[in-house]
Swiss-Prot record:
Tissue: Present in respiratory cells (at protein level). Expressed in multiciliated tissue in brain and fallopian tube (at protein level). Highly expressed in oocytes.
Origin: domain of life: Eukaryota
Stored PANTHER family: CYCLINS
Organism: Mus musculus (Mouse)
Main location: cytoplasm
UniProt-recorded name of the protein: Cyclin-O
Segments of this protein annotated with the region Disordered: 1-40
Compositional bias of kind Basic residues: 28-40
One Pfam family hit: Cyclin_C
Length: 352
């Protein structure tokens, strides 16, 4: 580094020298690399719904396994303005079909082998305070929350699976059941959603009955009880697999296959609230929902029930219960299905 020549302090040259030296010797200042924090967007307001009950839990759908006379529950009409339509299945791209050709069968075999490991049977056997009716009410409320946030069907399936598997391990008090449902929804959304709901939003849905610390503590308990084993095969996975298989094998037109998948998702959504359907595996439920959807849409090429290699008696038993479920909720289905799908449905007179 070159040092300027010294000058007397009182001379003008000294002052000029100081100014020049300061200008010449000034080192470039590096700007601090602080992270550029974006301004947080305000919480998206949720549409308020006047639902019965102080906890926000309501029964949106009727269950064949519960005591009902086949009429819609009062909460169905109360939540009519709060429910959004089920998004129709998106058209498959050439990349999706190519990926299915290369990895579809391998993924199916892997998921099918894991099915029994993640399938909770008789989840309420050890629950003295949680009943099938309270489970139906909680999941009906969670369905409404799921639509309100615009979450994927995969996250809903994982929520129900996490809930039932935890109920197998730990008795739950009735006053903590809603907190458990919200916790399972949060765990599921963290797995598959790009933008999961915030804790503040989920706690607000519970009417301020629970704290942030309670939710975080219960989340840790659920994860430890399940040994952090969360990647369960879902109905959504098998619905997508069988739909792609039908199109690849030429057993259904693309439009018909996607319409059947959308309707099958709506039927499967209803079945998640009914404890009677927990005895069936997700792959069997997917096949039966697609077969029922083909029948309601009057498709020429119906779903091959032998595809999943399930017993014929079990398939027919599941189909019969699904028909009963759809007949009971025939007035509720139009509010959870896209209009263009529901208009094409043809329900038998005996179901209406």
């Amino acid at each position: 580094m070159v040092t300027p020549c010294p000058a007397s302090p009182g001379s003008p040259a000294a002052g000029a020298g100081r100014r020049d030296s300061h200008q010449n010797l000034r080192a470039p200042v590096k700007k601090s690399r602080r992270p550029c924090l974006r301004r947080k967007k305000p919480l998206r307001p949720l549409n308020a719904c006047s639902l019965p009950g102080d906890s926000g839990v309501c029964d949106l759908f009727e269950s064949p396994s519960s005591s009902s006379d086949g009429a819609d529950s009062p909460a169905v009409s109360a939540a009519r303005d709060c429910s959004s339509l089920l998004n129709p299945a998106q058209p498959l791209t050439a990349l999706d079909l190519q990926t299915f050709r290369e990895y579809g069968q391998s993924c199916y075999d892997f998921r099918k082998a894991q099915e029994n490991l993640f399938h909770p049977r008789e989840s309420l056997a050890r629950q003295p305070q949680v009943t099938a009716e309270s489970r139906c009410k909680l999941l009906s409320w969670l369905l409404q929350v799921h639509r309100q946030f615009g979450l994927s069907f995969e996250s809903l399936c994982l929520t129900v699976n996490t809930l039932d598997r935890f109920l197998l391990t730990t008795p739950v008090a009735a006053d903590c059941f809603q907190l458990l449902g919200v916790t399972c929804l949060l765990i599921a959304c963290k797995q598959v959603e790009v933008h999961p709901p915030r804790l503040k939003q989920l706690l607000a849905l519970c009417g301020g009955a629970f704290s942030r610390q309670q939710l975080c503590n219960l989340e840790c308990i659920v994860l430890h009880k399940l040994h952090f084993s969360l990647g369960a095969p879902t109905i959504n996975f098998f619905l997508e697999h069988f739909t792609q298989w039908r199109m690849e094998a030429g057993q259904a037109e693309v439009t018909e296959a996607l319409e059947a998948q959308t309707l099958a998702r709506g039927v499967a959504e209803l079945s998640l609230t009914d404890y009677a359907f927990t005895t069936y595996t997700p792959s069997l439920m997917a096949i039966c929902c697609l077969a029922l959807a083909d029948g309601l849409l009057q498709h020429q090429h119906e779903m091959d029930l032998r595809l999943g290699e399930h017993p014929e008696a079990t398939l027919q038993d599941c189909l019969g219960k699904l028909q009963t479920l759809v007949s009971i909720n025939s007035s509720s289905l139009p509010r959870i299905l896209p209009p263009q799908i529901w208009e094409r449905c043809s329900l038998p007179q005996s179901w209406q």
